Amino acid sequence: MSAACGCDEPTTSPADEADEAERPWWRDPGLVVPILSGVAFGTGLALEWSGLHIAALVAFWAGLLLGAYTFVPGAIRNLVVKRKLGIALLMTISAVGAVILGYVEEAAALAFLYSIAEALEDKAMDRARGGLRALLKLVPETATVLRDGTSASVPAREIAVGDVLLVRPGERVATDGLVRSGRSSLDTSAITGESIPVEVAPGEAVSAGAINSAGVLEVEATAAGTDNSLTTIVELVEQAQAEKGDRARIADRIARPLVPGVMVLAVLVGVLGSLLGDPETWITRALVVLVAASPCALAIAVPVTVVSAIGAATKFGVVIKSGAAFERLGGIRHLAVDKTGTLTRNRPEVTAIVAAHGFDDAQVLAWAAAVEQHSTHPLAAAIAAAGRGTPAAQDVAEEAGHGIGGLVDGRRVAVGSPRWIDAGPLKARVEDLEAEGQTCVLVTVDGFLAGAIGVRDELRPEVPEVVRTLRDQGVEVSMLTGDNSRTAAALAKLAGIGDVYAELRPEDKARIVAGFSETSPTAMIGDGINDAPALAGATVGIAMGATGSDAAIESADVAFTGHDLGLIPQALRHARRGGRIINQNIVLSLAIITVLLPLAITGVLGLAAVVLVHEVAEVVVIANGLRAARARKQ
């Protein structure tokens, strides 16, 4: 909520909000008290119409006190303790002034309408955070842990790294881990937005919140029950809801000075009007001005939309880290895409081994696999998986964009691209493999060329359609890769991408993306260590979250929990729609003030009428903002 509201900021956690949201409305004092205020006010109107004026006055006072209870204490506390002038203070002054002038009925109307509008605003924000609460509910309350040969049910929050979990069919995985025994398929649709079940076997990773669809699994926890991938997503979304974008800051820049400005204007109207006319009339109009020009709707215009949109994005597998990133995402006109693991299926396989003279294929593969098992690069995983009986490697160091090296059985082994290691007598064979669309790495042992390994990673089937959709959205697509130009060109042709940059180091990618960003808003999407500098330098950095490296995820503004590149145009559509709703809300909020202010000064509308129009406008703005939560994976 905007600071301009002058209301107490909520301090509850998402878990607390989840509990509060599940309470029936009649047990929520934030809603019951305004309703009782309305009942008392309505009763007062009925009694007054019946001619029972004293009873009506009592009912109006009851409605006034009940409604005022919801905002007056907070307004005074903010003024005295925090030295903040808020909208609630304007309403308090108006209500007190109306009572002093003898307009108890109008004061009761103000208290009721403002309190019910604030209650609806709080409920709207709770609803907007519904996606976050849904994520929290994906983790089961208890989990079965195997200890000393027996199983025991323990609270999920007490799970520690190294615990072995027994996950039966139909149960959710309580925290991140590795399958120790068993095979099954997992439903991860609630986390990643992908409907196709994921097959898992021993040694493969599973995520918190996934549903075990088939066999019994034993899973060794790699994260504590309170610190896993789901809690990380929740923390990111919490931060996103707190951080403001340009339009949110514009709304605040207007709303904050508007509150004291309104107070000054009201004083001027009251003083100058009293000098020129009837003091009671002009003081009454001054009180109406306090309400007419208060930026209630403006204060909530952006937050409710951003919170709704960011929460909705998590439902289809997109985690947006800040309100600023959400707003920038809607303006993207250029997309730079990493090739390996992003455009490709991320299931590379070793397709060729060429040993140099004096070495054999098995030796070359074993040496390469020994060091590559320490790398996060998708191609490294293919080489590590292909090597059987892999020896241990020590003193391993990875140089992003070049390769990796280490000691294997006392020998210095290096694995890297042909740009880092000279192919020598294997150059012609390496070029042939690259022309076939394979990516080649070279292996040296103690400085001598041992061989070359060809790896192929197929293009994701959805890529051509995604590229066409992005073009239809007015987004230009460029491919960036550290791979050789021949392999890159072959894959780009299949993808329908005409703008290709190959044989790039991490610093080259960062430089190119920075150049793109200078001419048009640019997003960069990738998932590896070598993508991190480019992600950080883009207008919006997007990380493929499920398999991405920590460096890439930390550098990005947006993370995909799944692998479907169709999320890119969906995320852009979602952000653009949210941006349009934000603009609509800001324009509507300012229009209400512009229209009501002269009507208040000239006395056309009284206090009750202005309050009614103002609060109805706020409800309209809230309802419009909640439209941003209507997102579906397409």
Where are the predicted features?
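Bilayer-spanning, highly hydrophobic alpha-helical transmembrane segments
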Residues: 38-39, 249-277, 285-294, 303, ...
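Membrane-embedded alpha-helical bundles of multi-pass transporters
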Residues: 46-47, 74-80, 93-101, 312, ...
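Small-residue-enriched core segments of transmembrane alpha-helices in multipass membrane transport
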Residues: 61-64, 115, 257, 283-301, ...
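Conserved cytosolic catalytic loops of P-type ATPases
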Residues: 134-227, 324-368, 407-408, 519
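P-type ATPase nucleotide-binding
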Residues: 349-476, 485, 494-513
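Conserved ATP-binding TGD loop and adjacent catalytic N/P-domain core of P-type ATPases
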Residues: 410, 439-584, 622
